[in-house]
Amino acid sequence: MKRLGLLPWLAAGLAALPGAAQAHLVNSGLGPFYDGALHLLLSPGDLLGLLALALLAGLRGTTAARAAVTALPTALLLAGLIGLTLPVIPNLAWLSTLAFMLLGVLVAFDVRLPPVIIAALAGVYGTLLGLLNGSTLATMDAGVGSLLGIVLTAFMLVLLASAAVVPLHAFWARITVRVAGSWVVAVGMLMLGWLAQGAV
């Protein structure tokens, strides 16, 4: 009977033992490619920007979606390779947050931009993500394998999300996409508040 009384204490003691902390890059144990993919999937700011870009491109049609799907991974890969060689870039979380908020505003207001401008926005956002992620990977001694995981995951997310939006022509469906854009902006405002308080 007394042994059962010790079991909860033993379990609590084992649960309290700290494990290794990972500051930024997720170590999945599956290799650098999947570490990079998980890094992107677990970075809410990066995910929201990619989602907003995909929604914007999808609202503008097939040509704009194809332009974004081409420009984003190209810029992300090239800027990431440059970022791997740079010294540590200062924390620019506020710039990344403002960038995805801008994309969310464009979605929420259903701004009609030509495919060339969509491609340019995708290229600029991809460059920003590439420099920031490449520099982060360099500080973690992660290399091109992790960068490729990030690039291919971003490519697939934008490809699938924009492809889901392109065929939506019903008024209510387009409003739903625009509401999602407004939520991206709302989350960005929350993140800016956290950044201002130093919580992120």
Question: What does each of the following model-derived ranges do?
Answer:
Residues 2-200:
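Membrane metalloprotein/metal-transporter helix-bundle signature
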